[in-house]
Design a protein with these regions (language model features):
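C-terminal capping/lid region of NAD(P)-dependent oxidoreductase domains
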Residues: 4, 231, 235, 240-242, ...
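Glycine-rich beta-strand-centered segment in the early N-terminal region that forms part
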Residues: 21-37, 45-122, 685
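Beta-strand-loop-alpha-helix segment that lines the small-molecule cofactor/substrate pocket
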Residues: 261, 473-519
Length: 722
């Protein structure tokens, strides 16, 4: 299939070949018939992408601050590489389309193949032959509404939500500033709801179009508009003003204040500088509001991705119910869309269309609809011409990779591409855009959105999984079933029940494939050096580990029961494994305490202290906190043994104090990513034995769940048979 994407690095817009995205259990797969180009929004996105790095920094100073804080903590080089990786990732364009359902997931049973649907949402309702859309971002198209009309859904509900923010009543007088697509939809909805409407735009053609759509007074003159509003409201002013224009100045807001009555509402639906003269605002006690997207549920992962609806008794107009309402207005001919369509263009000419838009060749454009071919094959595997795949040599290992999130693309995939004897074969992600771009970037031979190719392809000798936590236990089972070596990003699993199932399965195996969990820290040169300093110790040691993890909101996916479960489960095995590597023994007893906060500004289980007793008599304490400053050191280790002390900080500087001081330093953080992947490949080749036994891997997860239990019961937990 083909899809329109933009490089945020260069601003270039291209029509590229992609594998068809996965439908997924909580999605529907839609064959697009039409999609709508949102000229204002998409032009702004492209213009930002075309700016230089300095221009982007000036446009988004908030992101610059975040990058600087990260650089102070993790080093300039690593932060720069991650930032460039984000800029390099292509952005799908488009957020409003219509088509026919071809597949529906088990959790999207409200839709069936053959349904005509309107789809909304950035990153979902894209300009592409096929789109994978969550149910709350789709709606069946009424019989009287054409597919072409339904493609206006997203713009329609942005307008509708902006109107709702004004909290209007029948007969209210509303002035609309800006008669682009958003404004022309707004004036029609307002009239359908019984409001008196006046409007203004600097383009006379759009003013004429508004008049054709029934607006009694529309003008290009701000003074004339002010006189008309004054006249029709008997000198009081408008009850509400909607700003649907796109402007960098404060003039639209200043004009809106002059047009408003006392205690009116100004709603910024488009873009404008919202720093008006305070005295003017104060004189009329006007409310200045901003309308966000398409209504409640917008940008909420639980609503958009998980399909959790908001109860109608509490939230009457979610974005999906807004979409239903907009389509009702269209079906009853209260909103006319055909007059708004100025261009109907074949999807195959999308690239040229964007070029013409940006070059100013389509000044008369209002509604630009892309039309798609009726038939496009569903192809989920895309092969590239042979390209270099990193260092080569004898006994190469064909590697298939599952998943390519931000962490994988920033750290693990670059390391894997440089790993000796690793031949990058196929990259699989659920998103075709991510799969195609990342596969080309790192030198894979092919990309796919179908996982089965990784297990069935004979040329793939090992699988690297960089997927969400809740998928990990299943992938271990797949690896065992196919006897295929697996490198699995931590954790091994997310529940004690999954761990028990894996233990039982492993015990039944006569031959177990290599399963290496991504506990990279034990492979760090700093840890290797600390192990050398510890190798001749005589007595049990005392180890203190501190992790300044950084705050993650309670609604983040890592806290979700269905995906991440908790940060303890998702991250703690890293530090348990590191303790096991440094001490050379397994934990046998656990005591743990957490803070007792409000579980919102402070997530209780993200702020814990765990005390571990090891089988060799050593003790280790782990302080894990999400309440610290991000600019402070993230990780520190102190070890006391045989009248010696080891201190290590952030995998950049390690020191041994023993009648003097020895120091081991590296230029940047060395957390062991390259080394762990090289070790995995060498194990698959039979050149090395696994550094971590399956017993140690399972035990680190047992310890994690033991910490959870100790926190819940506030009792000491004993682990048997260490």
């Amino acid at each position: 299939m083909k899809q329109v994407v933009q490089s945020y690095k260069t601003g270039e817009v291209t029509l590229r070949e992609m594998p068809v995205p996965q439908c997924g259990s909580k999605r529907i797969l839609v064959k697009n018939r039409h999609s709508l180009v949102s000229i204002g929004t998409e032009r702004m996105t492209i213009e930002l992408g075309r700016k230089s790095l300095l221009g982007k920094a000036k446009a988004r100073p908030d992101l610059v601050r975040r990058v600087w804080e990260k650089a102070k903590q993790e080093g300039l080089l690593k932060t720069y590489q991650e930032a460039m990786g984000r800029l390099d990732a292509p952005t799908p364009l488009g957020y409003s389309c219509s088509g026919v359902v071809v597949e529906s997931g088990v959790a999207a049973s409200a839709f069936t193949p053959g349904d005509r649907v309107a789809c909304i949402g950035q990153g979902f309702a894209s300009h592409a032959d096929f789109v994978s859309v969550p149910p709350n971002l789709a709606c069946r198209i009424p019989e009287k509404v054409s597919d072409e009309a339904a493609t206006f859904g997203m713009l329609g509900i942005i307008a509708l939500h902006g109107i709702r923010r004004a909290d209007l009543s029948f007969g209210s007088h509303v002035t609309v500033l800006g008669l682009g697509l958003l404004g022309l939809l707004s004036v029609q909805i307002l009239q359908a709801y019984g409001c008196q409407v006046t409007a203004m735009d600097l383009d006379a053609r759009k003013v004429n179009l508004a008049q054709q759509l029934g607006v009694s007074f529309a003008t290009i003159d701000g003074d004339g508009l002010q006189q008309q509003v004054h006249a029709v409201t008997h000198g009081h002013g408008a009850d509400a003003v909607l700003i649907t224009a796109a402007s960098k100045s404060r003039e639209p807001v200043d004009l809106a204040i002059r047009l408003s009555r006392s205690r009116a509402k100004i709603v910024v639906v488009g873009t404008a500088d919202i720093h008006p003269d305070r005295n003017e605002l104060w004189q009329k006690e006007v409310e200045l509001l901003v309308s966000r997207a398409a209504g409640p549920g917008s940008l909420d992962p639980l609503y958009e991705l998980e399909g959790v609806d908001l109860p109608i008794a509490e939230v009457r107009w979610t974005q999906n119910r807004n979409l239903q309402e907009f389509l009702r207005l269209v079906s009853e001919e209260r909103v006319q869309l055909d007059p708004l369509i100025t261009h109907r263009i074949s999807f195959s000419k999308a690239e040229q269309t964007y070029r013409r838009l940006m070059d100013g060749e389509m000044q008369d454009a209002v509604g630009v609809v892309l039309n798609y071919p009726e038939q496009t094959p569903i192809e989920r595997h895309l092969r590239f011409p042979q390209q270099k795949t990193g260092p080569s040599g004898k006994n190469e290992v064909g590697v298939g990779v599952l998943g390519a999130g931000l962490f994988g693309k920033a750290l693990l995939l670059p390391a894997l591409a440089k790993t000796a004897h690793a031949k990058l074969h196929t990259l699989v992600t659920t998103s075709g855009v991510n799969a195609e771009h990342s596969a080309k970037r790192f030198g894979f031979q092919s990309c796919a959105t179908d996982e089965t190719s990784l297990w069935n392809e004979e040329e793939i000798n090992a699988v690297v999984a960089l997927t969400p936590h809740h998928t990990h236990a299943r992938l271990v089972k797949e690896a065992i079933a196919h006897q295929r070596p697996l490198f699995l990003e931590k954790p091994l699993c997310v529940t004690p029940e999954e761990l028990d199932e894996l233990i039982q399965l492993i015990e039944k195996q006569k031959r177990l494939p290599i399963v290496q969990v991504g506990h990279n820290r034990r492979f760090s040169p700093h840890v290797q050096q600390m192990q050398k300093w510890l190798q001749h110790r005589v007595d049990p040691l005392v180890l203190q580990m501190r992790v300044n993890a950084g705050y993650v909101p309670p609604d983040h996916w890592v806290h979700s029961e269905s995906e991440g479960r908790s940060r303890i489960v998702g991250e703690m095995s890293h530090f348990i494994d590191l303790m096991q590597a440094l001490i050379g023994s397994l934990p046998v007893q656990i005591h743990a305490e957490r803070v007792d906060g409000n579980n919102r500004s402070v997530v209780n289980n993200d702020n814990i202290v765990a005390l571990l007793k090891f089988a060799d008599g050593s003790v280790g304490s782990l302080t894990y906190s999400a309440s610290g400053d991000k600019g402070y050191s993230r990780e520190a280790i102190e070890i006391f043994f045989d009248r010696k002390t080891i201190r290590s900080q952030d995998f950049r500087k390690s020191e041994l104090y023993a009648s003097g001081k020895q120091a081991f330093k590296t230029m940047s953080q060395e957390m062991g990513y390259r080394e762990e992947l090289q070790h995995f490949i060498d194990c698959v080749r039979g050149k090395e034995k696994p550094a971590v036994s399956m017993e140690e891997t399972l035990w680190s997860m047992r310890t994690v769940f033991g910490i959870e239990r100790a926190l819940a019961t506030r009792e000491t937990v004993r682990l048997e048979n260490a």
